[in-house]
């Protein structure tokens, strides 16, 4: 199974590392996450600007990891259109460091 993992807390967030570690039991794992914190970005995408994509060394063996100088939605687009040779079977978003409940879901970068 091919798994794409994204988040809105950034490539260095502890939650995404734990999710990648646990997901390795299920198959091939790709982590494509924002270079920095991008909470409350919802479905925002970057237009009319270049997006920097950087391969990252990751402390979870076997994980392919990239940081993206853009939003969580940009991360998904970049992964699907440029990085992954085949579409993922599943996309996980998180693990979030804050709550995504009630009205917060409308602007959540994790949910967006």
Regions found by a protein language model. Name each.
Residues 15-16, 106:
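Residues at alpha-helix caps and immediate loop-helix transition turns in enzyme cores, especially N-
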Residues 110-112:
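Small-aliphatic-rich amphipathic alpha-helix that forms the alpha element of a beta-alpha
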Residues 5-12, 104:
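Short, glycine-rich nucleotide/cofactor-binding loops
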Residues 3, 17-82, 86-87:
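A cross-family phosphate/adenosyl-ligand binding-site feature
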Residues 9, 37, 71-72, 96-99:
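Short glycine-rich anion-binding loops that position phosphate/pyrophosphate groups of nucleotides
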Residues 99-108:
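Glycine/threonine-rich flexible loop motifs
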Residues 32-34, 93-96:
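Short beta-strand segments
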């Amino acid at each position: 199974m091919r798994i794409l993992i994204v988040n809105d807390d950034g490539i260095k967030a502890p939650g995404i590392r734990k999710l990648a570690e646990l997901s390795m039991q299920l198959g091939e794992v790709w982590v494509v996450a924002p270079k920095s914190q991008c909470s409350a970005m919802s479905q925002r995408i970057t237009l009319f600007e270049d997006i920097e994509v950087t391969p990252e060394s990751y402390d979870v063996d076997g994980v392919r990891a990239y940081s993206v100088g853009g939003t969580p939605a940009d991360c998904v687009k970049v992964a699907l259109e440029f990085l992954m040779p085949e579409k993922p079977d599943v996309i996980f978003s998180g693990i979030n460091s804050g709550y995504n409940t009630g009205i917060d879901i409308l602007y959540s970068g994790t949910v967006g």
